[in-house]
Amino acid sequence: MADEDYNDVDDLGYEDEPAEPEIEEGVEEDVEMKENDDVNGEPIEAEDKVETEPVQRPRKTSKFMTKYERARILGTRALQISMNAPVMVELEGETDPLEIAMKELRQRKIPFTIRRYLPDGSFEEWGVDELIVEDSWKRQVGGD
């Protein structure tokens, strides 16, 4: 069909923009007063909360890093390094992000926290620097 055929169609009564409702002047002031009704009186005094250190409970999980945690830590950190995240160790010619991540793990400089979930739904948080990397993994990472 040609464009000329559509020019004959009448406007179906739709407006481009809906008409704005007229607002009475007195109603506008009432709305502002209603918004401030809950703010009457003096402010409620909040107790000064002192930030306390989380209580160190005896941990239930192992202090050894699992191979799955190690893989995830190294992979995540290597991805960050490849996206130009700041490197936490001195570089000595390394360019591979995974090698740099391994060096950071070896020197315990990776700023991650591992959350281990327990069967009862609770969890424990361990810093990467708190966990022990097993000897067989140290050989792969290049440790002592």
From Swiss-Prot:
Identify the stretch(es) annotated as Disordered: 1-62
The biological process GO terms on file are: DNA-templated transcription
Biased composition regions of type Acidic residues, renumbered to the chain: 1-32
What GO terms fall under cellular component here?
Answer: RNA polymerase II, core complex; RNA polymerase IV complex; RNA polymerase V complex
Chief place of localization: nucleus
Checking SMART domains in the record gives:
RNA_pol_Rpb6
| Keywords associated with the record | DNA-directed RNA polymerase, Nucleus, Transcription
Sample GO molecular function, one term: DNA binding
Tell where it localizes: Nucleus
**From start to end residue, where is composition biased (Basic and acidic residues)?**
46-56
Family to which the UniProt record says this protein belongs: Belongs to the archaeal Rpo6/eukaryotic RPB6 RNA polymerase subunit family.
> How does the annotation summarize its subunit structure?
Component of the RNA polymerase II, IV and V complexes. Interacts with NRPD1.
> What job does the chain carry out?
DNA-dependent RNA polymerase catalyzes the transcription of DNA into RNA using the four ribonucleoside triphosphates as substrates. Component of RNA polymerase II which synthesizes mRNA precursors and many functional non-coding RNAs. Pol II is the central component of the basal RNA polymerase II transcription machinery. It is composed of mobile elements that move relative to each other.
User: What protein does this entry describe?
Assistant: DNA-directed RNA polymerases II, IV and V subunit 6A
Species, as recorded:
Arabidopsis thaliana
